[in-house]
Amino acid sequence: MGKEQKAVCVIAWPAGHSRSPLIHNYWIKQHKLDAEYRREAVPPDKFPEFITHLHDHGYIGANITVPHKETALKLTEPDERARAVGAANALWYKDSRLRSTNTDVEGFLANLDAVTPGWDRGLSTAVVLGAGGGAR
């Protein structure tokens, strides 16, 4: 790890299932970035302390997944999207403050558009099954 290398992580509990490091480190290598993407298994009772000191752990940002998204919203400065969904899944520092957003809805809709183009034409009602960020 270089002196100026950037580190980002996915924070989950458990975290072993996450393929995020594999995916992100592939693209980091492809673009020859001096960065690393790691996995952090943080239990719910330790999450507030970990997030409050994210920078002290060497991170410039993080992706958040189950079961921490709602807590992340409360511990950061969320944008409108995160507030609307009630959960945060992407964190970064700006002006030394930890900010957050939510990309679940955007990702859900992008996948729906890719699989079923025009799905929303003439649509007035829809049923979304689930309780995650995409369903909100």
Residue ranges and their predicted role:
Residues 2-118:
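Phosphate/diphosphate ligand-binding glycine-rich loop within oxidoreductases
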Residues 5, 122-125:
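Phosphate-coordination loops involved in phosphoryl transfer and adenosine-cofactor binding
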Residues 9, 127-129:
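Conserved beta-strand elements of the Class I
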Residues 13, 130-132:
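Glycine-rich Rossmann-fold phosphate-binding loop(s) that bind the pyrophosphate
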Residues 103-104, 124-126:
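Short, glycine-/small-residue-rich phosphate/pyrophosphate-handling segment
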Residues 135-136:
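N-terminal Rossmann-fold NAD(P) dinucleotide-binding loop
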